[in-house]
């Protein structure tokens, strides 16, 4: 099985278009929930955001495998990014993605989210995989969100 490079690049570009400063990751969480549920993953959002004064909790996703003893994969990423990320425009030069210079790219950690989400999509296509994932809120702020689950 191969990860679809076009899919993961498009996923990343879509993710960087959604601003997600620390403690205000609701738009990103809502997008993730929608995408993961559309792939057939079981999804829940916990109440970690309430505990830290944020707008969302951690997003948990799980895709049960259908083959006993099959290996599983676990993905973890955080949803917040170093500002400024509002209005990010992605530029591709020589096969490398950059911001246009007016904002940060937000690769930390939208790369992790894109990888996890794309693997979830691939896992839905190959159901022998077991796929647990968690996307933390407010990771940049002393791991607040990840410590509240």
Ranges and model annotations:
Residues 4, 24, 28, 108:
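Short, contiguous, pocket-lining structural segments
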Residues 21-69:
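A non-catalytic alpha/beta surface segment that caps or lines the substrate-entry region
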Residues 2-23:
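N-terminal capping segment at the start of a domain
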């Amino acid at each position: 099985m191969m990860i679809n490079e076009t899919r993961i690049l498009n996923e990343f570009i879509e993710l960087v278009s959604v601003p997600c400063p620390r403690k205000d990751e609701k738009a990103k969480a809502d997008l993730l929930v929608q995408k993961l549920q559309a792939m057939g993953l079981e999804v829940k959002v916990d109440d970690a955001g309430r505990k830290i004064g944020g707008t969302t909790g951690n997003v948990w996703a799980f895709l049960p495998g259908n083959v006993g003893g099959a290996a599983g994969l676990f993905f973890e990423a955080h949803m917040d990014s170093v500002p400024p990320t509002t209005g990010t425009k992605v530029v591709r030069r020589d096969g490398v993605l950059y911001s246009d210079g007016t904002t940060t790219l937000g690769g930390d950690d939208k790369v992790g989210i894109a990888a996890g989400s794309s693997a979830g999509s691939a896992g839905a296509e190959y159901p022998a995989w077991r796929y647990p994932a968690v996307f933390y809120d407010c990771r940049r702020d002393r791991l607040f969100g990840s410590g509240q689950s």
